[in-house]
Amino acid sequence: MSVVAIVGRPNVGKSTLFNRILGTRRAIVEDYPGVTRDRNYAQVTRYGTPFVLIDTGGFEPASQNRLLKQMREQSELAVEEADVILFVVDAKEGLTPSDDEVAGMLRRSGKPVLYVVNKVDGDSHEAAASEFYALGVDQLYTVSAEHGRGMDDLMAAVLAALPAPAKLDARSCEETRLAVIGRPNVGKSSLINRMIGVERLVANPTAGTTRDSIDTPFVYNKKSYVLIDTAGIRRKGRVQQKLEKYSVIQSLKAMERAHVVLVVIDAEEGVTEQDLTVAGYALERGRAVLLVVNKWDLVTKDHGTMKQYTEKVRHAFKFLPFAPIIFVSALSGQRVSKIMAEVEKVAIEFNRQVPTGVLNRVLEEAVLSHAPPMVQGKRLKFYYMTQTGVRPPSFVVFGNRATGVHFSYERYLSNKLREAFGFSGCPIRLKFKDRNARE
């Protein structure tokens, strides 16, 4: 997934622009129970194109102030991660030496940079904005982030500058792609190395199509898999708080190309908000999910510890009741071999296709057992169900007033599908259409 970073000096309106981009099209990933959205980054979809938007604190190149130096480091890290950079300047304050220095740094990055002159609230401010051509740029985007002026042109330029989505080769239709997602120091690298060692690597690692990730093809039980490793989150010399934030962004980029997501949890620390966040994004993107509790060897245990811990994880991830939970130790190798055995099962479920006749027998039995509620005082009748896709399993139910189905009944039918067919680790996409909408 592409990344767009907003950088610039403090108080030029970066956060206002960030909020404006989010607010102009409310297609941000929705929160799931227990999931909090970091206000400094968000996944956005514009005209069918998803990207991650980053807001930075501010960029003061020459400052020795500790806070401002930290903000500068944050901006530099955002530039490293970005595919497109929005460099925001202030039309009312005018061109400053700091603007010039930041522009030079951005040019050296080699990344596409859009120069955004903010606080141009009307035509009378356009003339003042022209002085920023002194930065040596061919085009300026004059906007008012506060009022929305000029945003359509800016967003069109952003979408045009984004790199084309990576195209998977024909082999990708037959292989299962795994993303191992975890916070820094959760033991993700050790787990990956242990998995590769256990499963006997049969192909050399190759550079992935997404920057800062490595694709490692391997074979398990005569089936092809590709492990997507977010190598970019393991940088030395970075402050932990920054790594926490940018590891989420790396996770989003990795899971965009994955089929199955392994969310790695630190058994000692327990479930964190970041664990919930990346799992929520995986669910929203329709990925299969496994919850892997690592460092289980470090937990003091008795006969009921695993059961109690499982209950805690289930409660935290209550929006993923279908996700298998595996307790492992990457250090000792304990139960690591069970991960791929479970992945193999989930991959089969993720690609499961159910004949229409079988589906409709399940639908009929479900309705007989529990009739759907009335819609606007009239009886709801279902005609048939059909499967429309896999990865994730997707279904459509046609009826006379199907679009009025209550979410509780949708959940009931989803549970009936799971009872009948399994779909372990897989989200189910279930839609309802009126019979006249079949075409």
From Swiss-Prot:
SUPFAM superfamilies: P-loop containing nucleoside triphosphate hydrolases
InterPro entries attached to this UniProt entry: G_ENGA, GTP-bd, GTPase_Der, KH_dom-like, KH_dom-like_a/b, P-loop_NTPase, Small_GTP-bd
Keyword hit for GTP-binding: yes
Domain KH-like: 352-436
Keyword vocabulary terms for this entry: GTP-binding, Nucleotide-binding, Repeat, Ribosome biogenesis
GO biological process assignments: ribosome biogenesis
Residues spanning the membrane: none
Molecular function (Gene Ontology), one example: ribosome binding
Alphabetized PROSITE patterns for the sequence: G_ENGA
Binding site for GTP 2: 182-189, 229-233, 294-297
Keyword Magnesium: no
Domain EngA-type G stretches: 2-166, 176-351
Residues at which GTP 1 binds: 8-15, 55-59, 118-121
Primary role: GTPase that plays an essential role in the late steps of ribosome biogenesis.
PANTHER family found in the cross-reference section: GTPASE DER (PTHR43834:SF6)
The family this protein is said to belong to: Belongs to the TRAFAC class TrmE-Era-EngA-EngB-Septin-like GTPase superfamily. EngA (Der) GTPase family.
Subunit record text: Associates with the 50S ribosomal subunit.
Protein name: GTPase Der
Lineage of the organism: Bacteria, Pseudomonadati, Thermodesulfobacteriota, Desulfuromonadia, Desulfuromonadales
